[in-house]
């Protein structure tokens, strides 16, 4: 049968999805299944690894059935995944020794403090590009080995395997034949030296993690093994892996230095490609691994906005100013500006480039003439201002000129927000026709690995732009608006 399709497995924090793409990068079918979130203690977040696998394998089968596609028509399967989430299982039985500890989980905070006390903070920053934080996998591994009965002894005997979610899915899809990850996921473990592109012996020793547990690291654009869907049909190559944010960067074809993307979700995730240069940030950004045009390792700067879409949820759920997130564009467009109102949504503190956990949200500039429309507009503008804060930090750190800003995520449907983002950053904002860029990135990597597509040049004709948003205000207005934002932020921190 002719190979007509590539399937992307998109394993996220709350659901598992499978998306089928044709040769023109059009979506043919989507299947999605949510799974259980476990909160055994305050600040702890877990998933059942077997439920992750069951949900992901079922949507893979379902996505083909919905489209009426035979598995023999599938050229390759790519994987993208929630990063940092940690799974440890028995090599012989494939049975997890504990639930998956999710990236959001804070239980290993004390281990991070111990590493800081050992003077490892700067070493971690220099060699992994990360901060010493329970967000990343390394301290989660140590917690499992320290707290699950007999786990450390088994690990030292070579009986246990570790993997992030990509590795777990590969292991299951190949029936235990392949124990592999890619550099984008390895770089989020706190154990991977992003310069030598190898596991860091000093950090493994500091956390007392046996190297034999760790997966082999192979390029993001590779064939790792094969699988049969539901045990039927021919073997399908498993080819192409990237963590979710790096997959979105590749799906947007940000493969050259200075190219950046912003994913607008509950928060916002911004990544800028810095080419073959691992830039150490002086603004609190992370240095991480990305994927280049030939599938080679590139580097990127990464920063996140804590309150993106969550700010709009606050307008809806706590203030009752809107019924639906889509209402914000209508109300914001009813006024010419915010009437001097600024909202700083520091509800959980401020992230990069401020890193101020004590800052709190505030509304500034309220007068008797301020109304609902002004507050809603200020909320939307706050998302763009926070994104500009990060983009400016990336430009200063990298020395790269921002060529354009590629965007994806739910909020990109809001034309007002996209236009204001272009205005305040003074750069063209590009919204793709296919906003499923995370899955598209995994599909592109898989398709390139097996020759379904020949090059990134060919992909540029597949990744179409839906709309260009060009800056539409003058420099003096931009400077005045942003100065007002900076003043508001400063006052939330005093």
UniProtKB/Swiss-Prot annotation:
One GO term under biological process is:
glycerol metabolic process
Reply yes or no: does the keyword Repressor apply: no
Q: Which pathway or pathways does this protein act in?
A: Polyol metabolism; glycerol degradation via glycerol kinase pathway; sn-glycerol 3-phosphate from glycerol: step 1/1
Binding site residues for glycerol: 83-84, 135, 244-245
Task: Report a single Gene Ontology molecular function.
Answer: glycerol kinase activity
Q: Which positions does UniProt annotate for sn-glycerol 3-phosphate binding?
A: 13, 83-84, 135, 244
Q: Known HAMAP family for this protein?
A: Glycerol_kin
Q: Family assignment?
A: Belongs to the FGGY kinase family.
The record's function comment reads: Key enzyme in the regulation of glycerol uptake and metabolism. Catalyzes the phosphorylation of glycerol to yield sn-glycerol 3-phosphate.
Protein name, per record: Glycerol kinase
Question: Can you name the source organism?
Answer: Shewanella sp. (strain ANA-3)
């Amino acid at each position: 049968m002719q190979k007509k399709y590539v399937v992307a497995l998109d394993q996220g924090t709350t659901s598992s999805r499978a998306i089928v793409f044709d040769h023109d990068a059009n979506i043919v079918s989507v299947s999605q299944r949510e799974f259980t979130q476990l909160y055994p203690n305050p600040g702890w977040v877990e998933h059942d690894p077997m439920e992750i696998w069951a949900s992901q394998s079922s949507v893979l089968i379902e996505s083909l059935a919905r489209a009426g596609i035979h598995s023999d028509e599938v050229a390759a399967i790519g994987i993208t995944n929630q990063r940092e989430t940690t799974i440890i299982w028995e090599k012989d039985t494939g049975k997890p020794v504990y639930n998956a500890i999710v990236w959001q989980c804070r239980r290993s905070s004390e281990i991070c403090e111990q590493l800081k006390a050992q003077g490892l903070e700067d070493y971690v920053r220099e060699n992994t590009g990360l901060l010493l934080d329970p967000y990343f996998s390394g301290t989660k591994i140590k917690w499992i080995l320290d707290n699950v009965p007999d786990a450390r002894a088994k690990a030292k005997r070579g009986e246990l395997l570790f993997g992030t979610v990509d590795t777990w899915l590969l292991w299951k899809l190949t029936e235990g034949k392949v124990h592999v990850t890619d550099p984008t996921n390895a770089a989020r473990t706190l154990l991977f030296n992003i310069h030598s592109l190898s596991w860091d012996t000093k950090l493994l020793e500091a956390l007392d993690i046996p190297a034999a547990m760790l997966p082999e690291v192979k390029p993001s654009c590779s064939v790792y093994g094969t699988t049969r869907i539901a045990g039927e049909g021919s073997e399908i190559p498993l080819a192409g892996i990237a963590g979710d944010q790096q997959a979105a960067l590749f799906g947007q074809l940000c493969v050259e230095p200075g190219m950046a993307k912003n994913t607008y979700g509950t928060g916002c995730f911004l990544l800028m490609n810095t080419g073959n240069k691992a830039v150490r940030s002086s603004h609190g950004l992370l240095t991480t691994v990305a994927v280049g045009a030939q599938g080679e390792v590139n580097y990127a700067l990464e920063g996140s906005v804590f309150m993106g879409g969550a700010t709009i949820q606050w307008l809806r759920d706590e203030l009752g100013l809107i019924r639906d997130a889509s209402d914000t564009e209508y109300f914001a467009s009813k006024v010419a500006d915010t009437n001097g109102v600024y909202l700083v949504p520091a509800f959980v503190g401020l992230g990069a480039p401020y890193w101020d956990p004590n800052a709190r949200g505030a509304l500034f500039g309220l007068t008797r003439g301020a109304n609902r429309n002004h507050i809603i507009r200020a909320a939307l503008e706050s998302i763009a201002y926070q994104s500009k804060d990060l983009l400016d930090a990336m430009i200063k750190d990298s020395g790269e000129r921002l060529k354009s800003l590629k965007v994806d995520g739910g909020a990109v449907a809001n034309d007002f927000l996209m236009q204001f983002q272009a205005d305040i950053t003074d750069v063209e904002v590009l919204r793709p026709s296919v906003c499923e860029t995370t899955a598209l990135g995994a599909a592109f990597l898989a398709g390139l690995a097996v020759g379904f597509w020949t090059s990134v040049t060919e992909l540029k004709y597949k990744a179409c732009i839906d709309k260009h948003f060009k800056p539409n205000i003058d420099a003096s207005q931009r400077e005045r608006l942003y100065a007002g934002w900076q003043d508001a932020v400063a006052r939330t921190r005093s």
